Amino acid sequence: MPPATQAVIKPANPGATPPTADLVALKGRQQASWSSGDYAVVGTTLQIVGEELCEALDLRAGQKVLDVAAGNGNVTLAAARRWCEVTSTDYVPSLLEGGRARASAEGLKIAFKEADAEALPFDDGAFDAVVSTFGVMFTPNQERAAFELLRVCKPGGQIGLANWTPDGFIGQLFKILGKYLPPPAGVKSPALWGTRARLDEIFRPGASSIRAEPRHFNFRYRSPEHFVEVFKTYYGPMLKAFAALDATGQNGLRHDLIALIASLNKASDGTMVVPSEYLEIVITK
């Protein structure tokens, strides 16, 4: 779709109003959730998304790149492999340690810093590019997070995002989890970051252009049951969901997840190949 332009560059600061107690509490629960399990087992399978996002941004050697809600560092490593000066941030220390170990194994020089996506500890316009793959979309205060991404990006710089869409496989998985463990009232779905309308709402005041292209990532597992077992063991949000339910609830959740996979599975040999739509987004400030 053709990009649109906007004359206004400086957005209003949504952080002028302190976050509500509910959002603060939710962030604490999210942090505990992402700290549980071992996200790297799942996260590293998504590496190709980080590589493709770096190509979409056309990153150049020497550019200063900030990865926000970096997890175990997929796009962090992808940018560093292109000789960028990368700073990798997350509010979960164990995830940063995973990224640091991966960088060390490849001999990549990367700065790692614990940071909240809604209150980034960097100066205005400090980075040529700001990136996040399936990370910043989970922030409770979406407006504040978008403001922070724009704030630390230099004028004319780029923000690159990969966000799951509401109707894709992971977006539908979110809806199933929400049926069993409803989010607090008023909390917006992270999958809204995968819609053009929401991107326009939270980024347009400070962006000169927004380009969003649908892409697909294929989840490949030994079987639908294998996917559920891996995610309930290593993916914090699903691990916490199963742990919070009684046996009846766990069986219902497992049944609904298997049914969702069956409805989308491209494999006919007992394995699982399920494409999940996401938006690859390039925002120019």
Stretch-by-stretch model annotation:
Residues 129-142:
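A short SAM/SAH-binding and catalytic strip from SAM-dependent methyltransferases
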Residues 64-119, 144:
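Class I SAM-dependent methyltransferase SAM/SAH-binding core
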Residues 191-285:
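Conserved Class I S-adenosyl-L-methionine
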Residues 118-129:
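A short acidic, Gly/Pro-enriched loop at the edge of an enzyme's catalytic core
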Residues 9-11, 15-63, 74, 98, ...:
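Conserved class I S-adenosyl-L-methionine
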Residues 1-10:
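N-terminal acidic, proline/glycine-rich, low-complexity intrinsically disordered segments
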Residues 143-144, 150, 154-223, 238, ...:
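Conserved catalytic/acceptor-binding region of the Class I
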